[in-house]
A protein has these predicted regions:
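Short polar catalytic/cofactor-binding loops
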Residues: 10-15
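CN hydrolase (nitrilase-like) catalytic-core segments centered on the catalytic cysteine
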Residues: 62-79, 131-198
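Active-site catalytic loop in hydrolytic enzyme cores
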Residues: 85-137, 148-149, 154-157, 195, ...
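Structural motif
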Residues: 38-39, 122, 139-140
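Binuclear metal-dependent phosphoesterase catalytic core
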Residues: 188-215
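Short beta-strand scaffold segments in enzyme catalytic cores
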Residues: 80-82, 93-96, 114-115, 178-182, ...
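Extreme N-terminal starter segment of soluble prokaryotic enzymes
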Residues: 2-8
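Cys-nucleophile CN-hydrolase/nitrilase-fold catalytic domain and related Cys-dependent amidase chemistry
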Residues: 18, 22-100, 149-168
Length: 216
């Protein structure tokens, strides 16, 4: 792949139904497709919202089918956040919509995910482990978040150190603003302010380049 185009969706939809969340996601997907993105990453629990007290029920595949169709139509891999029922517990999870798969893959959110350009699956990473289980071929680590200023500052410091220590680019999609991309040296490439937008990154022969694309 001569150039890899990625984007973080700074998505903060306040909807009461999964269908409305999906429709809102599709606006971001269409905008990312206009930018010729190969990968689009949404924040934590983007498909349901956080819920007032407990995590909401996980959406079923039929509710999410429009996103899988969009992944195939635009040839774009989509990672979105949703609740997941795992071993009798409801936890934060990720949904992977791949243009080369006929079904939706679901994973526990963990601390994030690493992936290889063009691959059909994610490797969920525990950044708190002594030696994170990063795929040695991975080019990018993604972090889906929905944090305010105090936790955001903690997150960006942690992710920048992670990028430098493990020599991997890091893309953070944060619902509340400040989404960012660091290169494999831990250097900040681009960081967003608040509001709904796409934060994009392109990996080519000259390294990473970044931009901010308004949603409207």
């Amino acid at each position: 792949m001569s150039q890899w185009n990625i984007a973080a969706a700074q998505y903060a939809g306040q909807h009461h139904s999964v269908d409305d969340h999906v429709a809102h996601h599709l606006r971001f997907v269409a905008k990312a497709a206009q930018q010729r993105c190969d990968l689009l990453v949404f924040p934590e629990l983007s498909l349901t919202g956080p819920g007032k007290t407990d995590l909401l029920p996980p959406p079923d595949d039929a509710q999410l089918a429009p996103l899988l169709a969009a992944a195939k139509r635009y040839r774009i891999t989509i990672i979105a956040g949703l609740p997941l029922d795992l071993n009798g517990q409801r936890v934060k999870g990720l949904a992977l919509f791949s243009p080369s798969r006929h079904s939706i893959l679901r994973y526990p959110q963990g601390s994030g995910a690493s992936l290889v350009p063009g691959d059909k699956q994610l490797t969920i990473v525990d950044t708190h482990a002594d030696s994170p289980n990063l795929d040695p071929q991975a080019t990018l680590f993604t972090s889906c978040q929905s944090v305010g200023d105090t936790r955001w500052r903690q997150s960006i410091n942690t992710l920048q150190r992670f990028a430098h220590r493990y020599a991997i680019a890091v893309l953070m999609a944060n619902a509340r603003g400040g989404s960012a991309l660091w290169d494999e040296k831990g250097q900040l490439i681009v960081r967003a302010d608040k509001g709904e937008l796409l934060l994009t990154g392109s990996l080519g022969r000259q390294g990473w380049q970044g931009d901010i694309i308004p949603l409207g």
